[in-house]
Amino acid sequence: LAVVFTTLAPLTNGAQWWVRGWDFPRLHIACVAVIAAILGFMLINTWTQIVAVLMICCALYQAVRIFPYSPMAKTELALTPDAPAEERVSLLSINVLMENTEHEKLRQLIDREDPDVLFLMETDAVWASALEEQLARYETVVLHPLVNHYGIIFATRLPARQAETVFLSDDETPTVLAELEGPSGAFFFVGLHPRPPVPGNDTEARDAQIKRAALLADRTYLPVVAMGDFNDVAWSWTAERFKEYGGFRDPRVGRGMLPSFDANSWLMRFPIDQLYLTEGLDLVSFDRLEHIGSDHFPMKAVIAVSPGE
């Protein structure tokens, strides 16, 4: 019954945290359903076999939902590894975990990767102070430190026509909007970190923030890259609407889940640190980097503005 409930609950599209939270462990639910189905068929009686059939249905449904994020599916965003080096833009997105005290690991990572665009989440004044040397290298820095796990640091060496934090929902979680001039053309950057579906946090504000960001992307004349800890898995209903409203493409489709959270657990990991691109942007690479003491892995992307954009 638990497998059936956790499979059916997200179909209601309810905003309650105990509904939306079941979007996350679809792979885990499918595995439990398969095991339950096998056990049900081994016990020869009508009731257990009915349960086994229900488990197979649940497993198949969950598999259909997550299949696009397997290497067997067709990709929706081709890689362009031959993009000229001088036209590439590197982006680094990291939820640092506000309580994480391993500042030196992040400093070394930033020094090594030297991204053109740096987007850090869960940053407070302590983190801002710890990264002063690294941030001083960037032409544009937007600091919005907070002590509620939703502080943001945005930094870029690209010419910025606009770079600011805005509030797209009423839950005091800022979003970064930036219009940047890349080597081969301009593009728009959206950095998101909405609240997760946990006890005390239903998802109305998260879903509204994600939807409004997508609509902003749809209205700009520039190609758009959206990046950050969405606190939402790639296969959720909200993520699908985000892609539809903004015309986004997901590099995970057809390549694998590339789970980014929880970095401290080998079993319960989910792809919630996202990268989305609209037409007009080419993807050179998208990678998960090493553990830096946070509960999220750093995510790095290299993009280029498509020729003619």
Where are these regions (language model features)?
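Hydrophobic alpha-helical segments, especially transmembrane helices
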Residues: 27-29, 66, 207
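N-terminal signal-anchor transmembrane helix
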Residues: 42, 49-112
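Secondary-structure boundary/capping signal
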Residues: 16, 46-47, 71, 139-140, ...
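Glycine/proline-rich, flexible active-site/cofactor-binding loop segments
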Residues: 33-68, 173-193
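Membrane-embedded alpha-helical segments of integral membrane proteins
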Residues: 1-41
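Intrinsically disordered, low-complexity boundary segments flanking structured domains
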Residues: 8-9, 77-81, 129, 237
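Soluble catalytic domains of enzymes that build or remodel membrane lipids, polysaccharides, and related
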Residues: 91-92, 97-112, 117-309
